[in-house]
C-alpha cells in the first residue's frame, strides 16, 4: 500500500520519514504554533482562514515564517490531494500544520548552520475517525469544569493557537475521573467560562447565541462559521462574560470545532442543560452548516 505524504521543511516525504530532532524547540520548549483544517468531500474547508490565523500566531510568537501564506495554501492543497487519492472518496481528512521556533544549539552540542537554525514547518494529514464524536453528536457532550484554570491572556494570548498544552492534559485527566466521556470546560481566574479542550463553547438563551468574549478564548474558525450562519438565520450573537450560572440556566449549549463543526452539549458537571437533549437552535445551525458543506454533517458523524 502506498504511504501517505507529509510536508517537512520544503519537501514532500513519506509520513514515516517526517521526524524532528530531539533538540528541536518544539520538543525542548513546546515552542510550537499549530492549526488544524478538515475536508468536506476531501476538499479543505476554510483553509485560507486557518493559514491566515497561523501566520498571526507565528507573528505573535516571534517565529519567522519560512514560506508565504499563499505558498502554504498551495502546499496544503497539493498534500491533501496526494493523500486523498489513497483513500475511499467518503473518507475525510484532517490537515495539521505546525511550525516550531527552530533548534536549541546547546542540546545539539554543535554550532548549527543557518539552514538548520530555521524554524521547522510541517504539514501532514490523517483520516478523520468520526466515531470519536458520534455519541456526542447524537446525545450531546457532558462538559466538566476541572480545577485547572485557563491561562490568562496576560501570560499567553488566547488568540494564538499553540501546542503547549500541558494544562489541558492535566485538566482532561481530572475531567475523565468524573466522566471518562466528558470534555473539559475551563474557567478563568475570575470564574468566567472560556473554552473546551479543542472547541469553543456557546450558549443559547431566549433566542440568542451567547459566547465568552474574545479576551480569553481562541477566535475559532468554526466559531466564525457559527456567527455567519447565525446572521443568515437572523439569530442574534452576543459576546459577554459568562459563568456556570449562565450555563446551567441556558436553553441549550453547543461546541464548535473543526472536526465536527457544531455539536450539542447537554450536561455540565452532571447537571442537565435545558431539557438534556440536543435543542432546536443547534439543529437549525447544523442544518445550515450542512447546506454550506454540501453534506449532512450530523449524519456523517452520528450514523
Residue ranges, per PLM feature:
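Glycine- and Gly-Pro-enriched alpha-helical subdomains that act as flexible
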Residues: 184-185, 192-214, 219
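Conserved alpha/beta cores of soluble small-molecule-handling proteins
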Residues: 1-185, 189-190, 218, 228-303
Amino acid at each position: 500500500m502506498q504511504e501517505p505524504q507529509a510536508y517537512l521543511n520544503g519537501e514532500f516525504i513519506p509520513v514515516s520519514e517526517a521526524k524532528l530532532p530531539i533538540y528541536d524547540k518544539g520538543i525542548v520548549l513546546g515552542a510550537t504554533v499549530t492549526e488544524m483544517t478538515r475536508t468536506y468531500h476531501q476538499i479543505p474547508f476554510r483553509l485560507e482562514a486557518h493559514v491566515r490565523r497561523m501566520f498571526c500566531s507565528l507573528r505573535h510568537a516571534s517565529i519567522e515564517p519560512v514560506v508565504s501564506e499563499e505558498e502554504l495554501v498551495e502546499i496544503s492543497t497539493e498534500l491533501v490531494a496526494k493523500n486523498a487519492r489513497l483513500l475511499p472518496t467518503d473518507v475525510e481528512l484532517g490537515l495539521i500544520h505546525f511550525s516550531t521556533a527552530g533548534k536549541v544549539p546547546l542540546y545539539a552540542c554543535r554550532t548549527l548552520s543557518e539552514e538548520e537554525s530555521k524554524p521547522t514547518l510541517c504539514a501532514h494529514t490523517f483520516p478523520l475517525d468520526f466515531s470519536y464524536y458520534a455519541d456526542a453528536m447524537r446525545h450531546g457532550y457532558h462538559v466538566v469544569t476541572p480545577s485547572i484554570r485557563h491561562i490568562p491572556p496576560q501570560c499567553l494570548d488566547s488568540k494564538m493557537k499553540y501546542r503547549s498544552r500541558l494544562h489541558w492534559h492535566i485538566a482532561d485527566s481530572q475531567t475523565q475521573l468524573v466522566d471518562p466521556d466528558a470534555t473539559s470546560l475551563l474557567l478563568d481566574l475570575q470564574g468566567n467560562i472560556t473554552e473546551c479542550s479543542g472547541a469553543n463553547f456557546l450558549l443559547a438563551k431566549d433566542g440568542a447565541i451567547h459566547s465568552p468574549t474574545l479576551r480569553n478564548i481562541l477566535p475559532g474558525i468554526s466559531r466564525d462559521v457559527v456567527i455567519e450562519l447565525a446572521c443568515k438565520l437572523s439569530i442574534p450573537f452576543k459576546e459577554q462574560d459568562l459563568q456556570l450560572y449562565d450555563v446551567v440556566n441556558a436553553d441549550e449549549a453547543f461546541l464548535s470545532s473543526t472536526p465536527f463543526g457544531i455539536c450539542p452539549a447537554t450536561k455540565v458537571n452532571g447537571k442537565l442543560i435545558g431539557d438534556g437533549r440536543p435543542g432546536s437552535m443547534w439543529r437549525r445551525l447544523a442544518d445550515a452548516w450542512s447546506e454550506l458543506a454540501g453534506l449532512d454533517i450530523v449524519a456523517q458523524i452520528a450514523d
